[in-house]
Amino acid sequence: GPNGKSQSIIVGPWGDRVTN
């Protein structure tokens, strides 16, 4: 995604990797 986060759960149309 636009934020380019980096944890374990891949979500969103951009495939952001975020903690969830």
From Swiss-Prot:
Keywords of this entry: Lectin
Summary of the function given for this chain in its UniProt record: D-galactose-specific lectin, binds the T-antigen structure Gal-beta1,3-GalNAc.
Family assignment from sequence similarity: Belongs to the jacalin lectin family.
Region (Disordered): 1-20
Assembly mode: Formed of four alpha chains and four beta chains.
Name of the protein in its database record: Agglutinin beta-3 chain
Claim: Membrane is one of the keywords in the record: no
Presence of the UniProt keyword Cytoplasm in the record: no
GO molecular function, one term: carbohydrate binding
Domain of life: Eukaryota
